[in-house]
A protein has these predicted regions:
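A detector for short metal-coordination/catalytic motifs
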Residues: 37-38, 45-96
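Histidine-centered nuclease catalytic patch
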Residues: 12-41, 56, 60
Length: 96
């Protein structure tokens, strides 16, 4: 939750742990996968609004959600890179 700034990926509302929901960016019902790169934290309201819409459909209806998502994706991308660097460093250290 820290990696997303504790905010909803779509509306940027502050998220409390008890009210955060997981959203599949590309819905499972439409061929999306249950993998880390396809799962984000969202508030319940945004998750319900998005439903099984594809990101392009949702962002066409709610452009501000698209802008927030772009900001969030950048944050997550950096966080994932940091995690990957740590994992690689640890793997090399164990192999040595």
């Amino acid at each position: 939750m820290r990696d997303c700034g504790r905010r909803c990926v779509y509306c940027a509302a502050a998220l409390e742990f008890d009210y955060a929901t997981l959203d599949h960016v590309h819905p499972l019902s439409r061929g999306g996968a249950h993998v880390p790169g396809n799962v984000v934290l969202a508030c319940g309201r945004c998750n319900r609004l998005k439903g099984d819409l594809l990101p392009t459909e949702f962002f066409a209806r709610f452009p501000s959600a698209g802008m927030n998502f772009i900001m969030y994706a950048r944050t997550v991308h950096r966080a994932l890179k940091r995690c990957a660097r740590r994992a690689v460093s640890l793997a090399y250290a164990r192999a040595a």
